[in-house]
């Protein structure tokens, strides 16, 4: 039988990989945003988004933009596709993190 530690370790690995996928997709979205939506790029502090001095309120602005699906009105299909991918990966990563934390407390 598979031990609880093995299950928890596997969940942690899967969660970690999906978090890396999410951050990579977010980085590519911000790169594409520079050309496709310069105003939003400036509003979310595109240059300083992943730095230690990044403005959290500007990062929350991007979260709300993607959460409310405002990108559906954009003309660039690549940009809307990246936004959709980031949104899906965020939901997946959040769910996996919740399941992993739940499993850590149960096991």
UniProtKB/Swiss-Prot annotation:
Q: Main subcellular localization, coarse class? A: membrane
* Tagged with keyword Manganese: no
Q: Where are the transmembrane segments?
A: 6-26, 86-106
| Compartment annotation | Cell inner membrane
Keyword check for Membrane, yes or no: yes
What Pfam families does this protein's entry cite? UspB
Q: Which terms are listed as keywords in the entry?
A: Cell inner membrane, Cell membrane, Membrane, Transmembrane, Transmembrane helix
Q: How does it sit in the membrane?
A: Multi-pass membrane protein
Q: Supply one GO CC term from the record.
A: plasma membrane
Question: Which family does the similarity line name?
Answer: Belongs to the universal stress protein B family.
**UniProt-listed HAMAP family:** UspB (MF_01088)
- State what protein this is by name: Universal stress protein B homolog
Task: Please name the source species.
Answer: Vibrio parahaemolyticus serotype O3:K6 (strain RIMD 2210633)
Upper lineage ranks? Answer: Bacteria, Pseudomonadati, Pseudomonadota, Gammaproteobacteria, Vibrionales
Its gene name is uspB
């Amino acid at each position: 039988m598979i031990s609880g530690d093995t299950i928890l370790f596997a969940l942690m690995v899967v969660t970690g990989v999906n978090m890396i996928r999410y951050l990579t997709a977010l980085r590519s979205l911000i790169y594409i945003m520079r050309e496709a939506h310069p105003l939003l790029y400036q509003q979310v502090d595109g240059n300083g988004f992943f730095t230690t001095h990044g403005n959290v309120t500007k990062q929350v602005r991007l979260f709300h933009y993607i959460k409310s699906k405002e990108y559906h009105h954009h003309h660039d299909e690549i940009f809307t596709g990246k936004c959709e991918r980031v949104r899906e990966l965020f939901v997946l990563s959040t769910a996996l993190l919740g399941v992993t934390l739940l499993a850590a407390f149960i096991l």
